[in-house]
């Protein structure tokens, strides 16, 4: 089965690799690893760090090629100049899914171009690439927080945005209404080849989701997006 065809795959990970995991306070790698460990996610977490044999008490590896066995999902918080080699390693190891998380607004135009070139080169049937804001991915029902944000309370609203700030605002509104999150992802719309339509299709019909809130993505194919919306609203209420 190709990486592209595995609907819902991200929502049942048993083994997650975090490339760029760190203990350095306030770094992106430290914040995301801390949230993964404190949620707490019940599956296996494997850190990748160039300098340390252990990170947060977990056995760490210097690169993907040294990790034994398979993994469901790779998370990378390393800079764009690492992407080309990282994607090659993912394909060699047959790790079919990777999510890139960065504070994109702090990066230079050259770094954006480096990221864009590597993503365009490697995204395809062998490797599915999603590009996220620091708000990343949260699945409260599975105690999974792959983001720099605090844990969202569990509830029945699926949230898909293109900005970390929008995710925070909607989450605060939901909390004031006494509501929580079933699934959340915050994409980098300009860079992510895996679109909001793709993710909406992956949301599928899920007992944990009664309504979905989506921030419109004008950068993607609108026909595909509205087709995904039509299919989704056959079983679940949606708001944009």
Question: What label would you give each PLM region?
Answer:
Residues 1-240:
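Catalytic-core regions of core metabolic enzymes
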């Amino acid at each position: 089965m190709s990486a592209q065809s595995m609907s819902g795959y991200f929502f049942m990970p048993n083994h997650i690799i975090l490339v760029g995991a760190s203990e350095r306070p306030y770094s992106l790698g430290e914040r995301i690893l801390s949230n993964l460990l404190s949620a707490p996610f019940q599956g296996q977490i494997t850190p990748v760090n160039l300098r340390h044999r252990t990170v947060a008490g977990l056995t760490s590896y210097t690169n993907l090629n040294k990790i034994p066995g398979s993994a469901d999902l790779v998370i990378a918080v390393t800079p764009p100049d690492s992407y080309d080699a990282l994607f090659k390693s993912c394909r060699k190891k047959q790790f079919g899914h990777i999510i890139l998380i960065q504070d994109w607004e702090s990066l230079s135009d050259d770094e954006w171009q480096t990221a864009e070139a590597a993503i365009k080169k490697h995204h395809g049937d062998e490797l599915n690439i999603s590009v996220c804001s620091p708000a990343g991915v949260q699945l409260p029902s599975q105690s999974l927080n792959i983001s720099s944000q605090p844990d969202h309370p569990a509830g029945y609203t699926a949230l898909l945005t293109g900005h970390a700030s929008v995710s925070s605002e909607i989450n605060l509104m939901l909390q004031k209404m006494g509501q929580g999150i079933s699934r959340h992802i915050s994409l980098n719309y300009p860079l992510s080849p895996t679109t909001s339509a793709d993710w909406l299709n992956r949301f599928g019909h899920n007992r944990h989701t009664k309504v979905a809130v989506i921030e419109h993505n004008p950068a993607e194919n609108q026909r595909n997006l509205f087709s995904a919306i039509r299919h989704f609203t056959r079983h679940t209420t949606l708001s944009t």
